[in-house]
Amino acid sequence: ELVEYLCAALEKEKLFVWGGSWGTELGTYLCFRYPEHIAGYVGSGQLVNGVLNEELSYDFAMDEAKKAGDTKAVSTLERIGRPVDGCYREVFKGMMAQRRIMKKYGGHSMNKGTYWTDTALPLLRSREFSFTDKLGLALGYKRCLTYMWPTTSKCDFPRECTRFAMPYYIFQGAHDNNTPSALVQAYYDAIEAPDKDLIW
């Protein structure tokens, strides 16, 4: 309905869809299930398989922490445990703990900043959002991940979505271990589309 509304409002027959990280799950399902008004898809930080994604991301964080002799990080990862069916025991807390360690060792980007310095602090300093907006974003993010992640982690695109009626493009970081690049190449190879490209 939203795509049809936007096409009418913008007086366009078709729109391009862009998804980043979790948005690649939404975008891929949208393009696969409702291709009529989609001109093309562009994804970055492409999700491929929710369960394998989390397992590989956890393993990367654990391996890097062990190599660095970071006993505190290893202990944290052992405490939260390897994800089961793509989810940590304490969904939000476990995921955030793993993501902090994964990011610390360059698994999110080559910038080894923290979520605090790279995400939270710039948001807090932003003049574009009110205090209420910022609080709502933080609480909404936590609530959203806590309740939606068990469903989100069930996606398996190589099994569910490989044939597309529109061009399908992926921009992926070669060192990405948040949405592991190790899964992306095999998925890309399986995709059938009028045009496709994987840009590293």
Feature roles, as predicted:
Residues 164, 170-172, 176:
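Short beta-strand/loop motif that positions the catalytic acidic residue
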Residues 189-200:
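Catalytic histidine neighborhood in serine/cysteine hydrolases
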Residues 2-14:
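Conserved acidic catalytic loop of the alpha/beta-hydrolase fold
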Residues 62-159, 166:
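Alpha/beta-hydrolase
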Residues 15, 19-24, 173:
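Conserved alpha/beta-hydrolase "nucleophile elbow" surrounding the catalytic nucleophile
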Residues 177-183:
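Conserved alpha/beta-hydrolase "acid-adjacent" motif
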Residues 25-84:
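A catalytic-pocket lid/entrance helix-loop region that shapes and gates access to the active site
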Residues 5, 29-33, 186:
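Active-site signature of alpha/beta-hydrolase-fold catalytic machinery across serine-
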